[in-house]
Amino acid sequence: DAVHDRNVAHDVHVTFDVAALLAEQPTPETERIRNARLDQKPYWNLERCRIGETRKVPVELIVNGEPVATKKIEADGSTQSLEFDVDVKESSWLVVRILPSVHTNPVFVEVSGKPIRASRRSAEWCRKAVDVCWNAKQGQIREFDKPAAEAAYQEAREIYERIIAESAGE
């Protein structure tokens, strides 16, 4: 829809084109890929997404890190147009993915001029990551630069603590 009042939640109509290509039938090599752990190469191979013995893969709409809708497509290499409708009640980010192989960049949906505060758990992870990063890097920072670096890291801590307090979901 071309015009929306940004101050109210809306049903968002998501449209996109997607293509995926798999061999018609699994082979010993594709089975090896499918059965490999996710931390083993080839990491992002589409074969990991094949549904059973079919040539289909799941295409998911993700809102704030959570799958909200799934459709299956035939992975025959053709471009297919898909649509999802989702109710967006608060500012959110949306991506489309074929797990665990590919995903789009996020699309940001703003509601009522509010920032995205989707996941307290994610914000807590980021807050802890600031300390991990500081502990790993502080010994490599020149003494002259250390006060400014400490101030920047402290500001990051405070920002993430505020985001944690403002977060709506788990």
Q: What are the roles of these predicted feature ranges?
A:
Residues 1-170:
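C-terminal functional module detector
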